[in-house]
């Protein structure tokens, strides 16, 4: 049973009846064929005596099969076959050639020019009706297949527009980069063609505590994007009840209580959430099924910040742990990202790894403003495609001095 609110494709396809067009200069033949078909109430019969009007008549009646005489005045029957096959609206209609003679060479030429069948007139009634039904069924299937394909393309275009609007909405919610002060941020978000559920943000909780977070909802599409936006708004507004947003493990536990899968269309999300204390220069963090954040100091030391927690929404009674790391004096960089930033198939088939991403980010970037863009271009070149299979999201937090 189709989901509520959705119409099955079979219900929107056009029902086509069987329509026969006979092209023959002899009215007696037309009368005979009409008599053969008169008891077949589901077959509509049309007759064209003038071969010069055959194409126009076919355009008017839209036959599902054409019966065409081979020997007619003014136009040779084989030439008329060429005309039918050259017309863009008529070229696929099944065409049965009628002839008074059984000639192998003529048959071969007719088939070579595009005829679908060959009958010596007049055939037995049962045989004629069987061939009409057989060829019409094939053509009707072709029409409905083409119609279904067009409907699918329209649906895909509508979905693409919907996803583009959703992506624009997600981007509009992301915070402005911080370009001055002791904490600075840069980020890039490149949605995939299917639009995943990536979202991120940062804000000052109070004068000393700076929150940073990135989440990734499972799956793709508008549903995933809406859930990520809901979670983002909760974090930005700090609207989880009885939760100290300076304590990451409590934040994840409260998110898990608020966003259980059974209440959100079986969707869950992973998250990395951290809080920097600018007085102590300590980052407290917790991750729920999410890739580690990478902390790179000015001395080139790298730390993977990750905790062994379950993703958000999977189990109601999950407990969460947090970790802590000190940021030494001097410049340091923290990279928070989704798995789309490194789980990228190379053109040769292997997948890029977290360790390779870490090695890529380790050197001080020659142009910090273009660092994340440069990474994305690198992944595009490695993948061999302009768009990656998953959302690419990366947030860089720089600690100055």
Kindly give the residue locations of the regions a language model identified.
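C-terminal catalytic subdomain
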Residues: 328-335, 341-401
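Active-site beta3 strand of CheY-like receiver
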Residues: 61-67, 71-72
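Two-component/phosphorelay signaling modules centered on CheY-like receiver
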Residues: 13-19, 27-46
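Active-site residues of response regulator receiver
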Residues: 24, 69, 99
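… and, occasionally, acidic/histidine-rich disordered N-termini of signaling adaptors
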Residues: 148-335, 384-401
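The feature encodes the CheY-like receiver
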Residues: 73, 82, 91, 99, ...
